[in-house]
């Protein structure tokens, strides 16, 4: 997990928000703006487009922050006209390049996750991320453009303005947030917090997070979102096998 999301999780564990009300996460990317064929938007090859490719990350964070999801409503859209045939000359089903998902959590809180691959994001990585979390005790707000901004703000219910929240050195582990792209590379490539951590857990017989069970639960939410969009209705997670 990146330093910002680790810090948000710590603050939630310390009940910074009090009773959680709702969250709004936006994942803006631009890699889907090109009209050429791409396997990422081929339903058979990718499984889903923006929903599974990038929306899944923020859906997982939503569950990590606010707990289990009970119901899902979603709308998946395709804005970019792409070729009717894949490179082999076969027709294919075009996957979504934009998705918006409404989550209902078991504690009564709500969440909105928006994932788009067709946003114009004039930054080196072509992405921006936004996090808003609200509760009885206050608000947390974070965002990054993966170039110059990597910021987390907070305001308790009795405060009149936001304060920048420092990301502790314990979480940074020596990473320099001033160089945001280097921080990302160190987190996921040098420190082994993705594949390396998983391999170490298998070799040592220990448990790592996220688990396969976590992944299966997120897949159920994705399946519920696809069904909701197809049938135009709210879907209960327990009805998804």
Spans of model-derived segments:
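Glycine-rich phosphate/pyrophosphate-binding beta-alpha loops
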Residues: 56, 115-123
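Predominantly a Rossmann-like dinucleotide-binding segment in NAD(P)-dependent oxidoreductases
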Residues: 1-93, 232
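Beta-strand scaffold of nucleotide-dependent catalytic cores
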Residues: 20-23, 112-115, 143
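C-terminal hydrophobic helical "lid"/dimerization subdomain
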Residues: 215-229
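A general structural signal for well-ordered alpha-helical segments in protein cores
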Residues: 4-5, 58-59, 191, 195-196, ...
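C-terminal glycine/acidic-rich active-site capping loop/insertion
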Residues: 84-86, 92, 100, 104-105, ...
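Terminal low-complexity tails and localization/encapsulation signals of metabolic enzymes
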Residues: 233-241
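Glycine-rich beta-alpha junction loops
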Residues: 1, 26-31, 76-81, 107-109, ...
